Regions:
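ABC-type ATPase nucleotide-binding domains, specifically the catalytic core motifs of the NBD
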Residues: 12-13, 31, 52-55, 74, ...
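Short beta-strand immediately N-terminal to the Walker A/P-loop
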Residues: 31-32, 86
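Short coil-to-helix "N-cap" segments within the ABC nucleotide-binding domain's helical subdomain
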Residues: 58-63, 109-125, 132-139
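Conserved ABC ATPase signature
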Residues: 96, 137-141, 145
Length: 149
């Protein structure tokens, strides 16, 4: 079960984005976050998945627990391995390139030398299906496989 209790997120030490957010999501339950632009939907998901950039905001109060264990300070990769992830709707891939080339091209964005290979290996470890299809043309992947990519 995912439990969020009294979550508060502040941007730039002054802008209160989330205040008092509490929710329990049972295993297997499907939940939708609805709200106007700027309501905090993306911030909530980024806080849960560990992707809240420290330059964007800080969790200043509250707890985030999954199956009884705190995940608030956990590395995003460990959160994914525990079964929590955010899948974005849009797919931006190079359909004419291989899976391998797509992953390597994506790795060059704001990366230091050597980090591309490390990032590539990490993704291949997280998504064995992509590893099995690394030489395939990305445009021939299923929709779900394209989202993984």
């Amino acid at each position: 079960m995912l439990e969020i209790a009294n979550l508060e997120v502040v941007y730039n030490d002054v802008i209160l984005v989330l205040r008092g957010l509490s929710i329990e999501v049972r295993n297997g339950q499907i939940v939708a976050l609805l709200g106007a632009n700027g309501a905090g939907k993306t911030t909530t998901l980024r806080a849960i998945t560990g992707l809240l950039d420290v330059h964007e905001g800080d969790i200043t109060k509250g707890t985030i627990r999954f199956d009884g264990a705190s995940i608030a300070d956990m590395e995003p990769s460990k959160i994914v391995r525990s079964g929590i992830t955010q899948v974005l709707e849009g797919r931006r891939i190079f359909v004419e390139m291989s899976v391998d080339d797509n992953l390597r091209a994506g790795g060059y964005t704001n990366r230091k030398r050597g980090a591309v290979q490390e990032s590539y290996e990490r993704v291949m470890g997280l998504f064995p299906i992509l590893s099995d299809r690394r030489r395939d043309t990305a445009g021939y992947l299923s929709g779900g496989e394209q989202q993984m990519l």
